[in-house]
Amino acid sequence: AESLIEVLDAIRDFFDVTDDCEITLETNPGAVSEAYLSKLHDAGFNRLSMGCQSFSDDVLKTLGRIHRSKDARESFAAARAAGFDNINLDLMFSVPGADEDVWQDTLDQMLELSPEHISFYSLQIEEETPLYDMYKNGVFAEVTDEADRKMYHSAIECLKSSGYEHYEISNAAKPGFECRHNLKYWSLSDYIGFGKSASSYIDGVRFTNATDEGYGKGVLMERDFLKNSKTRNMIESSDAEFAKYKYSEFHVNDFMDTASEFVFLGLRRTAGISFDEFEQLFGKRFADVYSGRRNEIEPFIESGDLIEDENGLRLSERGFDISNKIMAIFV
């Protein structure tokens, strides 16, 4: 706890942190105690995100998780006792061997806890993982697209009927508890990450810190560079020696990069994108920028997967099922 508190104190020393700032702590069930969480809550952490994934022990075993469902319930109770009144639970569906009834039971148990925020994701079986090896060896069959979509929509229906607002493809929240830092990403606002592998987006520049020991060397070299250089421009200094060590990726967006990111990130939200906001940000009308792709956009509007009016563009609930295909138009 002390190291996390030191990080938070350092941020407060160097930045203006508002009294109502959302400060999220991520954890896993069974990994924290009430005393530990109380110390962090007292220090200023006010939102907790917990990787439950499921309330089925069989599903947790399939996923290779070391906790069990009772650990999730106990950790949630500990968080409430520690003072956290803004808690997110991560859940996963389309796990091999877990049918719609198992998923519904997880949703029901989640609702009994009544967290403020829910993130729900479809399992993607990635290569070079134990699950992929089991799949390739015929231990289980991949969940069908039809079953996957049924579980997704049952989650949305269940959450809406319980007072949650479905505000992003994979996220729902009680009114006023939308995840602020995720909304920053989806609205293309600036953010900064510290430490190895951390990613940032500032003034149209995307960069990711290195993962190896070179990062520390790069930070020290950057300090010396800034002492002896007049430039404070990130792009101008990206060719400096320190940048080769500090960053694993460094990309300067051009106009279309930024416009496209604004659109496909904005379409993740159920509210979609605003044409007025687009024009204010880019000085051009959305219709003019994407006039050459109108023939790709129009079929999705006609099919009801995309909804366009005078205010903006958004995905329909059915459109969320093929969101990757639609967003690919703008990449």
Task: Give each language-model segment a name.
Residues G312-S316:
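Minor-groove-contacting beta-hairpin "wing" of winged helix-turn-helix DNA-binding domains
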Residues A1-A287:
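C-terminal scaffold of the Radical SAM
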Residues F278, R294-S303:
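Basic amphipathic alpha-helical segments that dock to polyanions
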Residues I301-N311:
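A short, conserved structural fragment
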Residues E2, R294-E298, D321:
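Auxiliary N-terminal substrate/complex-recognition segments of SAM-dependent methyltransferases
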